[in-house]
Amino acid sequence: MRHQLRIPLLSKPADQRKALLRGLTTQLIREGRVTTTKARAKALRNEAERMISLAKEGSLASRRRAIGYIYDKKLVHSLFEKAKERYGDRNGGYTRIVRTVSRKGDNAQMAIIELV
């Protein structure tokens, strides 16, 4: 049964879903914005905000957790350097989801997720 399922399944097995979200999180932190489907953007928001919260905390343990999740090690170090000054006064809500036009091929709802 599907009662109280906290994460969206995204029609993928667990390993593929985790790899997809890791890749999207890495790309979002690198580029600042990602265009994807609305369901993926909503799932990505949780992971990206978790990584930014770890970066704001700044401890060695949180840095190691972020290195274990984000694919690019240099990107993690730059995130930890910039997160406190960029998001220091903000308690969550580090991302914004903006809906865009539907995808032409399958009419999927698309969205742009960007860092605030």
Swiss-Prot record:
One of its GO terms (molecular function) is structural constituent of ribosome. It comes from the Bacteria. One of its GO terms (biological process) is translation. One of its GO terms (cellular component) is cytosolic large ribosomal subunit. Pfam families: Ribosomal_L17. Keywords: Ribonucleoprotein, Ribosomal protein. Part of the 50S ribosomal subunit. Contacts protein L32. HAMAP family: Ribosomal_bL17 (MF_01368). Belongs to the bacterial ribosomal protein bL17 family. This is Large ribosomal subunit protein bL17. It comes from Prochlorococcus marinus (strain MIT 9301). The lineage of its organism: Bacteria, Bacillati, Cyanobacteriota, Cyanophyceae, Synechococcales. The gene is rplQ.
